[in-house]
């Protein structure tokens, strides 16, 4: 009898189920999503006037190229979804038809929208739909998927977020390797307190406009599997 009880106690499946249904496991698998829905809905309602003004502002600044940017991104378990962001660059091209460098296409309005992180606000729609969470690893480009190591790929075990643990510790000013380590740390430590801490640090960084991009670049250098 004692041996049977010990076997049940050491059963990894039963332990994982218990962890999911208690403590922070319950937050991770139920309350986190509930908070995402409630907060994103209220935020969209409150911020609607701001979103409307920025939409019109960017439409004219982008010379008719539109105010929104939609792109395929991998979400939880690698499932592809359309991310929504404010468009901060024009579609201007050179004589051969190639897009001009990012630095030349980034408008003054777009630069302001980026530096204040306003460009991320439309992702509240993705959060409401369930594609994303308020807090989690940032959703990156689809072409990065085959470049991840097995450990780095663990970042897709949770929904991607508007902000995350990596954004609190350097954002675009740290290497990809460092960023992925921080992402995986978050996956292993999802909790209400961690998410509250991320929100607090994110607000402070946004107000200070800290760690927006690497010095001298409009966008961060792409991931190549080794950097």
What positions do the PLM features span?
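A short, structured surface patch at a secondary-structure boundary
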Residues: 102-159, 199-202, 206
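Flexible, Lys/Arg-rich cytosolic regulatory linkers and terminal tails that connect or flank
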Residues: 1-27, 31
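A hydrophobic, helix-centered structural microdomain
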Residues: 19-91, 198-227
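Short, hydrophobic secondary-structure boundary micro-motifs
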Residues: 54, 68-69, 98, 135-137, ...
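Short, glycine-rich, amphipathic interfacial segments at transmembrane boundaries or analogous
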Residues: 4-11, 66-105, 163-181
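Positions in alpha-helical segments
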Residues: 40, 69, 107-111, 143, ...
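C-terminal terminal-structure detector
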Residues: 2-6, 22, 157-227
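An acidic site on a long C-lobe helix of protein kinase domains
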Residues: 30-33, 49, 105, 117-123, ...
């Amino acid at each position: 009898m004692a041996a049977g009880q010990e076997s049940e106690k050491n059963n990894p499946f039963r332990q994982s189920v218990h962890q999911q249904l208690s403590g922070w496991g319950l937050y991770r698998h139920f309350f986190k999503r509930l908070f995402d829905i409630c907060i994103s809905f209220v935020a969209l309602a409150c911020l609607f006037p701001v979103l409307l003004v920025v939409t019109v502002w960017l439409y004219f600044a982008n010379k008719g190229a539109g105010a929104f940017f939609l792109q395929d991104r991998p979400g939880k378990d690698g499932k592809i979804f359309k991310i929504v962001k404010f468009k901060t660059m024009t579609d201007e091209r050179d004589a051969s038809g190639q897009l001009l460098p990012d630095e030349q296409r980034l408008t003054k309005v777009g630069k302001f929208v980026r530096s204040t992180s306003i460009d991320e606000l439309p992702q509240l729609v993705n959060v409401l739909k369930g594609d994303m969470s308020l807090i989690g690893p940032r959703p990156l480009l689809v072409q990065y998927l085959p470049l991840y190591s097995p450990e780095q790929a663990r970042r897709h075990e949770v929904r991607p977020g508007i902000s995350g643990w990596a954004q609190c510790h350097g954002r675009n000013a740290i290497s990809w390797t460092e960023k992925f380590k921080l992402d995986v740390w978050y996956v292993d430590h999802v909790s209400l307190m961690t998410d509250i801490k991320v929100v607090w640090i994110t607000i402070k960084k946004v107000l200070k406009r800290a760690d927006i991009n690497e010095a001298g670049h409009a966008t961060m250098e792409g991931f190549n599997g080794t950097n």
